[in-house]
Swiss-Prot record:
Lineage: Bacteria, Bacillati, Bacillota, Clostridia, Thermoanaerobacterales
GO MF: phosphatase activity; zinc ion binding
Binding positions for Zn(2+) 3 per the UniProt entry: E74, H102, H133
InterPro entries listed in its UniProt record: Phosphatase_YcdX_put, PHP_dom, PHP_phosphatase, Pol/His_phosphatase_N, Pol/histidinol_Pase-like
Cofactor(s) needed by this chain: Zn(2+)
Protein name as it appears in the record: Probable phosphatase Teth39_0577
NCBIfam families listed in its UniProt record: PRK09248.1 (NF006702)
Entry-linked Gene3D superfamilies: Metal-dependent hydrolases
Protein family: Belongs to the PHP family.
HAMAP family reported for this sequence: YcdX_phosphat (MF_01561)
Alphabetized UniProt keyword annotations: Hydrolase, Metal-binding, Zinc
E.C. designation(s): 3.1.3.-
Residues given in the record as Zn(2+) 1 binding sites: H8, H10, E74, D194
Native species: Thermoanaerobacter pseudethanolicus (strain ATCC 33223 / 39E)
Binding site for Zn(2+) 2: H16, H41, H196
Length: 245
């Protein structure tokens, strides 16, 4: 399966990443990607950018180094109600929004009901597009309930390559179970490198192994065609009243 876009990348503005957007785009071009999503951490992540940073992403060009750039964020899910660390006024200006649980913002717990509720409530937010690294073992979830919500609200579940390489140790089994259930239920998948340095942009090898082993086909994967993400965003804009019916 060939992927032509990366839905999850970070720049130095995330506080603990090491490359600029230009460096990320240059690496993406070298690897044959057509598009990357710029998804720096939301402001409640220590060292992350102020909310004004996200409000001003509009100044970036649509293409850098020959690669299309979608301006976005990886927001932090803050509580069981699915509240996020950026206000609606900022979220509505962004192209793409990943919502994730991080231990500095949401206390890790074995409470499956609590974790599941937080993610499902984030899914219900009309500005959220992707649930980031849901296989993290420090946040056990009811996989079927989360996937049912994702399908109902037309959102994507992420298979995150860094979960198998450098972060969230022990994610492999959960990610496979998520991928397998997504295949069974017809839930759509986004594959993200979660690159925190330019060299990792477009690294999908481990995530692709999981997808293959779970039997997921191209029709369920957002990253196989730039047209898919553009069509999704057009429909999202229509649903939230951003353009005329």
């Amino acid at each position: 399966m060939k992927l032509v876009l990366d839905t999850h990348t970070h720049t130095i503005s995330s506080g603990h990443a090491y490359s600029t957007i230009t460096e990320n785009a240059r690496e993406a071009y070298k690897k044959g990607l057509q598009l990357i999503c710029m998804t720096d951490h939301g402001p409640k992540m220590p060292g992350a950018a102020h909310l004004w940073y996200f409000g001003n992403l509009k100044v970036l060009p649509e293409k850098i180094e020959g690669v299309e750039i979608l301006k976005g964020v990886e927001v932090n899910i803050m509580d069981e109600e699915g509240n996020l660390d950026l206000p609606e006024g900022i979220l509505k200006k962004l192209d793409i929004v990943i919502a994730s649980l991080h231990d500095v913002c949401f206390e890790p717990s074995d409470d499956i009901e609590r974790n599941t509720k937080a993610i499902i409530n984030a899914i219900k937010n009309p500005y959220v597009d992707i649930i980031g690294h849901p296989g993290n073992p420090i946040y056990p979830i009811d996989i079927e309930k989360v996937l049912m919500a994702a399908k109902e609200y037309g959102k994507f579940i992420e298979i995150n390559n860094s979960s198998f390489v450098s972060s969230r140790k022990g994610s492999e089994e959960n990610c496979f179970l998520i991928a397998k259930k997504a295949k069974e239920m017809g839930v759509k998948i986004a594959v993200g490198s979660d690159a925190h340095v330019s060299f990792d942009v477009g690294r999908f090898e481990e995530a692709l192994k999981v997808i293959k082993n779970a039997g997921i086909t191209e029709d369920l994967v957002l990253n196989t065609d730039v047209g898919k993400i553009k069509e999704y965003l057009k429909e999202k804009k229509r649903k939230i009243g951003g353009e005329e019916e």
